[in-house]
Amino acid sequence: MVLGQGRNLIRGNSYLRPDWENVVTPVIDYALTREEIDQKKIILAGWSFGGFFAPRAAAYEHRIAALIADPGQWDAADSLNTAMINKISSLLNIDEMLHWRIVRRGFWALNVNCLEDFFKSMSNFKLSHIVQNIRCPTLITLPEGDPIASGALALYKALNVSNKKLVHFSEEEGSGGHCEMLARSLYNQRVFDWLAETLAL
């Protein structure tokens, strides 16, 4: 199952929300009405910020047979302290890309109007208080050089499931960077091999 918020944010006039279980559960409810779906082999995979949303949903939705977070993420505001917030604030007017990511895109996606509300809203995107509720086999990716993968190891260590795997992707093998975009075939090979073994496909 592949879910995302990109188009819905633009055409659906909705906003980014952390409670992704309220999105995934109705989708699984529907999937289970389809006779071609194997009810015991539903997989939830999250890419990019989906590496937060998929684990969040899996903490509440226990009909998922396997979980993939690419890359694994942790609490969005975990690295934010007063010094970091002040530094970001001072850079917003001189760093065009940072301004685009936070002010133009971030404010819009979260439906906020100021930096304080942006950081407050981002603090709702966290897994530390619910990660212990994830029950299914889980694969976490950790691509070298991916700026949003800094929480992958924390997520992996906090998981309390017997079948968990942390998969590294390196610049040397051409699979570093955000979501292994230049080596998705290698990503697919490693993930599908794990799924085949985990779910006896």
Q: What spans do the regions from the language model cover?
A:
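Catalytic active-site module of serine/aspartate enzymes centered on a nucleophile-bearing elbow/loop
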Residues: E180-L201
